[in-house]
C-alpha cells in the first residue's frame, strides 16, 4: 500500500547456504517446539536475502538494506529490555530505488557463538538473523532464528559421587552414583545401601530436577522443574539391602549445565533421592550433577585418521575379513603372551583369536579397524618358532642356521611355536595348526625374510615406545 508516495512495500526472505545442515528442535516462547537449522561455535553463517516487490514494476525507495547476526537474552519479567551479547551487521545495498526483485548474498565467517540456545520458564537465549530495508517512516524487517549447540570436551576429572546420609539412630543409608558429570545421552548408574533401618519405609524414588535462576539480588527468580521421576523401591527394606539405580537420560529434553550466562541466568541439575515412610513423611537428599553436550560424531576424526594413515600402511594382500576383524597384539603384548603360553607346553596349541586378545578389544574405541590391523602387521613377530625366554636374543643366529640346515619339524607340544603363530595375523585365517610338510626352497626364503624383521636387543627399546604411541585410545578417555 502506497502512503503519500513514500514507496511500495516488499517481502523479505532469508535463505541459508548448505542444505545439508542438521536441524534441531527448540522450544519457542509460546512453548511450541520448532525445527531450526543447527550451527556450532566457530561455524560460518552465510546465505542470501531475497527481496520481492509485491507489485512488479513498482518502485521502492529505501535508505539502505542491511543484515544483522544477533545473540540476545530476554528476561520475561523485564520484556522491555533485551540484552544483546552479540551483534554483527553488514550492509547489502546502498540507499536508492528498488525497481525489481533482487537477491543479496551475505557471509558471517567463523562467528563466535559462546552460548547455547535456551528457552526456560523465565528467560530465553536466542540467535537470529535480521534483514532490514530502512525506510523513512517504517522499516521492513524479517527475522529468522537459528539453533546453536555448544560441544564440550570430555571432563578431565569425573569422580563418582558417594555419600552417607540419614537420621541419627533411625535411618542410615549410603548412596553412590558412578559419575558426577554426564553427557545428555548418558546413563546414570548407582546404588542405595541401607546401613541402619529403624523406621517403616513405604517406598523410595529418584527424580531429576532442573533449577533455573534468573536475575541478581532482589530481582532474582528461582524456578524448579521436575524432569523425570522414578520409583526405585516399593516396600520396607532391611539392613544390608542394596537397591540398584539405572536412569537413561536420552529420552528427556535436557540442556547442558549453564553457570552465570552473561551474568543473567543459570541452569543447574540435581538428583533428588526421596524416601517416604508409612506416615507419609518424606526424607530427601539432593546432589548436583553436571550435564554436558557430546558430539554425535567426533568432528576431528577424519583429520586424525588421515594423519595416522600417513605413518601406517595396510598391506594389499590382507584379506578384507581380516582387515575388518579384531586386531592382533602388538610387539610388546605378543612377547608377553608368548612367554605366558610357553609355560603351558604340555597343553594343546593355542587356537587363533584367543580370549586374551578378545578381552582387550572392549578397551579400545575410536580408532578404525584398518589402523589397528596396519599396526599389528608391522609389529607382529615372525612365524619361525623361537624359545620364549630368549625370543629376541636368538633371532639372528636362527636366521643363519635356517639357511644351511632344513627347518626342524614342529611337534604338537611346541608351545612357543603355537603361541607365536597365534599372535600373527596370518595364523588367524585358519582354526588349526599348519600341516607338517617338508620345507621347500620357497618356504625357506619366506622364513628367512620373516626372520630378518625380527627386532634385535638394541632395537626393542625403540620399538616399544612406538607401539604405545600408536595404540588405540582407551574407551575410558573417549
Curated annotation (Swiss-Prot):
Localization annotation: Cytoplasm; Membrane
Disulfide bonds: none
UniProt keywords, alphabetically: Cytoplasm, Membrane, Protein transport, Transport, Wnt signaling pathway
Ranges of compositional bias, category Polar residues: 367-379
Biased composition (Low complexity): 303-323, 347-356, 386-406, 416-431
Disruption phenotype: Accumulation of wg in the Golgi, preventing wg from being secreted from the cells.
Membrane topology category: Peripheral membrane protein
CC per GO annotation: cytosol; endosome; retromer complex; retromer, cargo-selective complex
Annotated segments matching region Disordered: 298-478
Single Gene Ontology MF annotation: cargo receptor activity
Any one Gene Ontology BP term: intracellular protein transport
InterPro entries, A to Z: Arrestin-like_C, Vps26-related
Domain of life: Eukaryota
Protein family per UniProt: Belongs to the VPS26 family.
The protein's role, per its UniProt record: Component of the retromer complex which acts in conjunction with wingless (wg) and clathrin-mediated endocytosis to sustain a wntless (wls) traffic loop. This loop encompasses the Golgi, the cell surface, an endocytic compartment and a retrograde route leading back to the Golgi, thereby enabling wls to direct wg secretion. The hh and dpp signaling pathways do not require the retromer complex suggesting that it does not play a general role in exocytosis.
Name recorded for this polypeptide: Vacuolar protein sorting-associated protein 26
Gene: Vps26
Amino acid at each position: 500500500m502506497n502512503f503519500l508516495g513514500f514507496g511500495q512495500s516488499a517481502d523479505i526472505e532469508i535463505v541459508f547456504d548448505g542444505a545439508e545442515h542438521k536441524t534441531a528442535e527448540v522450544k519457542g516462547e509460546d512453548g511450541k517446539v520448532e525445527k531450526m537449522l543447527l550451527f556450532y561455535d566457530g561455524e560460518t553463517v552465510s546465505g542470501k536475502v531475497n527481496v520481492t516487490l509485491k507489485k512488479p514494476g513498482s518502485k521502492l525507495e529505501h535508505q539502505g538494506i542491511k543484515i544483522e547476526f544477533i545473540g540476545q537474552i530476554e528476561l520475561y519479567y523485564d520484556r522491555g529490555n533485551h540484552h544483546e551479547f552479540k551483534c554483527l551487521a553488514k550492509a547489502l545495498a546502498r540507499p536508492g530505488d528498488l525497481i525489481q526483485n533482487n537477491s543479496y548474498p551475505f557471509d558471517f565467517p567463523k562467528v563466535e557463538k559462546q552460548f547455547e540456545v535456551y528457552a526456560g520458564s523465565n528467560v530465553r537465549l536466542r540467535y537470529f538473523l535480521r534483514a532490514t530495508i530502512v525506510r523513512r517512516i517504517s522499516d521492513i524487517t524479517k527475522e529468522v532464528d537459528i539453533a546453536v549447540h555448544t560441544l564440550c570436551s570430555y571432563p578431565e576429572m569425573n569422580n563418582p559421587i558417594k555419600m552417607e546420609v540419614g537420621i541419627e539412630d533411625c535411618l542410615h543409608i549410603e548412596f553412590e552414583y558412578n559419575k558426577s558429570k554426564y553427557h545428555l545421552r548418558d546413563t546414570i548408574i548407582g546404588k542405595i545401601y541401607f546401613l541402619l533401618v529403624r523406621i517403616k519405609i513405604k517406598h523410595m524414588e529418584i527424580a531429576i530436577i532442573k533449577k533455573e535462576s534468573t536475575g541478581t539480588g532482589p530481582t532474582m527468580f528461582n524456578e524448579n522443574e521436575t524432569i523425570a521421576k522414578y520409583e526405585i523401591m516399593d516396600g520396607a527394606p532391611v539392613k544390608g539391602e542394596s537397591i540398584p539405580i539405572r536412569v537413561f537420560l536420552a529420552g528427556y529434553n535436557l540442556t547442558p549445565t549453564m553457570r552465570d550466562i552473561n551474568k543473567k541466568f543459570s541452569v543447574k541439575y540435581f538428583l533428588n533421592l526421596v524416601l517416604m515412610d508409612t506416615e507419609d513423611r518424606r526424607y530427601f537428599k539432593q546432589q548436583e550433577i553436571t550435564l554436558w553436550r557430546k558430539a554425535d560424531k567426533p568432528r576431528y576424526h577424519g583429520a586424525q585418521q588421515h594423519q595416522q594413515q600417513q605413518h601406517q600402511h595396510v598391506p594389499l594382500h590382507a584379506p578384507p575379513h581380516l582387515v575388518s576383524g579384531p586386531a592382533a597384539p602388538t610387539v610388546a603384548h605378543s612377547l608377553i603372551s608368548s612367554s605366558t603360553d610357553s609355560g603351558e607346553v604340555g597343553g594343546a596349541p593355542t587356537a587363533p583369536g584367543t580370549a586374551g586378545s578378545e578381552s582387550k578389544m572392549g578397551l579400545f574405541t575410536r580408532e578404525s579397524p584398518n589402523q589397528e590391523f596396519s599396526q599389528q602387521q608391522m609389529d607382529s613377530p615372525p612365524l619361525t618358532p623361537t624359545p620364549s625366554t630368549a625370543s629376541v636374543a636368538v633371532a639372528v643366529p636362527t636366521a643363519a642356521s635356517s639357511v644351511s640346515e632344513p627347518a626342524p619339524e614342529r611337534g604338537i607340544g611346541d608351545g612357543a611355536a603355537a603361541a607365536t603363530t597365534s599372535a600373527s595375523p596370518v595364523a588367524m585365517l585358519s582354526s588349526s595348526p599348519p600341516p607338517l610338510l617338508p620345507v621347500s626352497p620357497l618356504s625357506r626364503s619366506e622364513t628367512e625374510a620373516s626372520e630378518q624383521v625380527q627386532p634385535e636387543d638394541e632395537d626393542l627399546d625403540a620399538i616399544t615406545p612406538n607401539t604405545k604411541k600408536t595404540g588405540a585410545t582407551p574407551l575410558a578417555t573417549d
